[in-house]
């Protein structure tokens, strides 16, 4: 089951179901078919595990399920952030923006690592842009926030993702069951390493950072389709009327951004 764990005593419910399959019990889905754990292992030529003393507890009394979900979400978030830098750079070209806001000196004056990296990425992407070069001597002093502040917004998300990566890395290499056995001193110590709070806060942070990437992206889309702001044909289509161009695409983006705000509400404060 995807639900049933509050994380305060490890992921007992989902991990129990996963672990049952590992020993040939329970149920699993293979190639779209639901079957017994024993048949699922046989279908993949895997022998059931024979657990030794203490291994059953280690399998279920930890944060492995949260780690797995966090890893998948972080992987997608990092990929999303790379594409966000590319999309912002393309928007800068389309809206006849300037690269001056990405000058390294600006970002060294406020040296957040993510901000510096985002600005560097956007400079690199646009360095040979003939479109931007064609109007570099125009009278415009500065661009709209959605373009000019892209490194600051994207960079904050980059830094958030780096923090989440560190938390997940520590958790992946940690021992989270209880009780812990220390052979060198021949001691059994009870503790609370199974508690999921470090991961919960990190994953909430991850969700907020992703939502912010979407917010500024949607605002750039709105600027692109709005002729009063972009100087381009309305909804990026020459002949309006029957053809509404990218109007609905912007509507969809706005709807997704609103949905993200609810999804990004911190779950850790209500658990």
Q: What are these language model-derived features?
A:
Residues 2-22, 58-67, 72, 76-89, ...:
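Conserved phosphate/anionic-ligand binding catalytic regions in large, soluble enzymes, centered on
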Residues 197-271:
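C-terminal catalytic subdomain
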Residues 1-6, 48, 188-197, 236-243:
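A short glycine/serine-rich beta->alpha loop
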Residues 92-215, 231:
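Accessory "access/gating" subregions that flank catalytic or transport cores
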């Amino acid at each position: 089951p995807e639900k049933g764990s509050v994380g305060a005593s490890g992921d007992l419910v989902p991990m129990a179901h996963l672990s049952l399959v590992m020993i040939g019990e329970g149920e699993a889905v293979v190639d779209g078919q639901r079957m017994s754990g024993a048949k699922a292992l046989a279908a993949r030529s895997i022998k059931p595990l024979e657990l030794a003393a203490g291994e059953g507890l280690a399998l279920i009394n930890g944060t492995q399920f949260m780690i797995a979900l966090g890893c998948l979400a972080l992987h997608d978030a990092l990929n999303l952030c790379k594409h966000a830098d590319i999309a912002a750079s393309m928007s800068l070209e389309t809206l006849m923006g300037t690269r001056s806001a990405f000058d390294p000196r600006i970002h060294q004056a406020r040296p957040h690592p993510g901000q510096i990296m985002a600005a560097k990425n956007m400079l690199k992407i646009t360095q040979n842009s003939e479109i931007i070069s064609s109007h570099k001597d125009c009278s415009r002093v500065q661009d709209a926030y959605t373009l000019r502040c892209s490194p600051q917004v994207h960079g904050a998300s980059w830094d958030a993702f780096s923090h989440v990566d560190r938390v997940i890395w520590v958790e992946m290499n940690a021992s989270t069951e209880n009780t812990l056995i220390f052979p060198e001193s021949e001691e059994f110590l009870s503790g609370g390493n199974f508690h999921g709070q470090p991961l919960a806060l990190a994953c909430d942070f991850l969700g907020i950072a992703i939502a912010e990437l979407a917010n500024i992206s949607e605002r750039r889309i709105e600027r692109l389709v709005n002729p009063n702001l972009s100087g381009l044909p309305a909804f990026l289509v020459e002949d309006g009327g029957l053809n509404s161009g990218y109007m609905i695409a912007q509507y969809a983006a706005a709807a997704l951004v609103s949905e993200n705000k609810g999804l990004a509400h911190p779950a850790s404060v209500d658990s």
